[in-house]
């Protein structure tokens, strides 16, 4: 009986130890390979000089902006992005009738303004939107990027200020 228990104990010990030993050896080999790659000066130089993709080049997430059942028969026409309505600055333009929404607002993009929506720069002219309106940003020295529900000011040149004017 003693020999049977001893042999079962040794077999159990082997069954537990052998996978642990193989795992340890595999981890050790992978660690050495990783360290060898990370110690390579050419690889480090390539990593430092690598350029990252700009935001507009990242995969685009498509949102279904159709809320016809919630907003009546016309639906929201200005929901997903600004809609160009004129070439001139028409301050009194009625965006509420175009967008079928009383919250719709008008804003103007001047000839030297750079506003980017979904990776496309807006042309000069007046726009209607039900999203936020770009404000408090120095449009002469910055690019305005529109994301899902807000505008972000990014300075074209880091020496200039991109925030509020005045």
UniProtKB/Swiss-Prot annotation:
Supply the name of the protein.
Uncharacterized ORF22 homolog
Database matches in Pfam families: PIF2
Where is the organism placed in the taxonomic lineage, from the top? Viruses, Viruses incertae sedis, Naldaviricetes, Lefavirales, Baculoviridae
């Amino acid at each position: 009986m003693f020999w049977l228990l001893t042999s079962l104990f040794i077999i159990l010990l082997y069954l537990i130890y052998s996978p642990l030993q193989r795992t340890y050896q595999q981890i050790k080999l992978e660690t050495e390979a990783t360290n060898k790659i990370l110690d390579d000066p050419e690889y480090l130089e390539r990593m430092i000089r690598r350029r990252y993709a700009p935001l507009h080049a990242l995969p685009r997430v498509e949102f279904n902006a159709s809320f016809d059942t919630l907003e009546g028969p016309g639906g929201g026409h200005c929901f997903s992005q600004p809609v160009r309505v004129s070439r001139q600055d028409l301050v009194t333009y009625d965006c509420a009738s175009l967008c079928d929404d009383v919250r719709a607002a008008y804003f103007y993009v001047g000839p030297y303004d750079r506003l980017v929506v979904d990776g496309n720069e807006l042309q000069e002219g007046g726009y209607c939107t039900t999203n936020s309106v770009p404000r408090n940003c120095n449009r002469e020295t910055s690019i305005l990027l529109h994301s899902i529900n807000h505008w972000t000011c990014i300075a074209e040149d880091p020496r200039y200020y991109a925030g509020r004017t005045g």
